[in-house]
């Protein structure tokens, strides 16, 4: 996946994997200092859980961050990326 970006900018990749073998790209991307949004809606329930478990375990191993956006969407970020959630900004989450 080749995504153009502004000079000095960060990349944010969106993955919609269908099976577990696609999850390795998530870890490789975070190790390359890219944040990744994982959207599991296109995977079956069992496969989605395996994807999430694999990615979360990988994040633990490399010191990355995991943030749950909703039931099917997660943000995985390198340790040096500052992630501010609505709660951190003092806003009401609906």
Regions found by a protein language model. Name each.
Residues 1-44, 49-94:
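Positively charged, small/polar-rich N-terminal and surface patches that mediate targeting and assembly
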């Amino acid at each position: 996946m080749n995504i153009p970006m502004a000079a000095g900018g960060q990349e944010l990749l969106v993955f919609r994997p269908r099976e577990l073998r696609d999850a390795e790209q998530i870890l490789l991307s975070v190790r390359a200092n890219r944040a990744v949004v994982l959207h599991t809606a296109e995977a079956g329930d069992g496969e989605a859980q395996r994807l999430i478990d694999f990615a979360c375990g990988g994040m633990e191993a490399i010191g990355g961050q995991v943030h749950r956006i909703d039931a099917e969407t997660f943000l995985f970020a390198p340790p040096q990326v500052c992630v501010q959630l609505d709660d951190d900004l003092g806003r009401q989450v609906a």
